[in-house]
């Protein structure tokens, strides 16, 4: 029997609910759910609990378990992680840490569960996989994360101090 998972509320609380082919409804994760995205066999999302605030979580519908990926910004505020993007065996996403108001590019290795800051302070948005690398927008320029060298560099569309202000990336 298969199941359909999604964020919903029955009036008493929201979370990830599953319903099987017989119509059996179960609350699998109780809490806020934002940015639900399928990554491999799991659903990744920005979830919350009273202790950690909004942090990256994952849910596996096969064994019906949910877990917090990491407490990136300790305390009840949270890292506001999002834009989860799979590249090879790594999930990349944007999240803030103790640097006030600054978002960084993070990488999470699915096989080792190692989490690292892949690009410091770049304010990444619109993470897009292109030819085995990660392209993303920053407030000033496009940036590329090279998975071979584990380094990032600007793609300088508009040379000079003004930048190009990229947005609405689309893979063709």
Give the positions of each predicted feature.
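Feature 14080 marks short, conserved micro-sites in well-ordered regions
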Residues: 1-172
């Amino acid at each position: 029997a298969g199941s359909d998972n999604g964020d919903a509320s029955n009036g008493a609380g929201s979370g990830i609910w599953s319903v099987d082919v017989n119509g059996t409804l179960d609350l699998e994760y109780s809490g806020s759910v934002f940015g639900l995205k399928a990554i491999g066999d799991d659903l990744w999302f920005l979830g919350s609990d009273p202790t950690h605030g909004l942090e990256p979580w994952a849910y596996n519908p096969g064994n019906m378990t949910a877990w917090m990926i990491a407490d990136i910004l300790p305390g009840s505020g949270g890292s506001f992680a999002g834009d989860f993007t799979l590249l090879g065996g790594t999930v990349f996403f944007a999240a803030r840490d103790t640097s006030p108001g600054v978002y960084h590019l993070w990488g999470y290795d699915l096989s080792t569960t190692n989490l690292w800051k892949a690009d410091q302070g770049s304010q990444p948005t619109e993470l897009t996989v292109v030819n085995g690398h990660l392209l993303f927008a920053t407030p000033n320029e496009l940036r590329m994360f090279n998975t071979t060298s584990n380094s990032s560099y600007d793609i300088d569309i508009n040379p000079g101090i003004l930048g190009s202000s990229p947005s609405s990336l689309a893979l063709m």
